[in-house]
Amino acid sequence: MTLQECYTKMGADYAPVLQRLGSERIVTKFALRFLEDKTFSGLCDALDAHDAEEAFRMAHTLKGICLNLGFEPLRQASSELTEELRGRDLSVDYADAFQAVKTRYQQTVSAIRGIAG
């Protein structure tokens, strides 16, 4: 799978990312590093531990990473979760927003694994 096909599979637009980062090699490097990133697992751990501050921080960090890498569907889902958690109150119903992040994360990782080899 090509890098452009990877972005298409995840529902993202490759061209702006390539333009912003400057080369396919750099985009590939950072996309593959995303597979090792612990932000999503940190989000899951924080929610399991009922740590609202850390959950917000992890959701916000994930949103930023996805913005930089052009992983738009996951960025949008993590942005919605970030807003749900902004008040640092886990009594709000964030389950649907978290499920959307989880689904988009799995789709994104699956697409990236297609270029990993």
Please identify what each model-predicted range represents.
Residues 11-61, 91-116:
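Long, amphipathic alpha-helical coiled-coil segments characteristic
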Residues 1-5:
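Intrinsically disordered or compositionally simple regulatory linkers and C-terminal tails
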Residues 39, 51, 55-58, 66-86:
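Short, well-ordered alpha-helical segments
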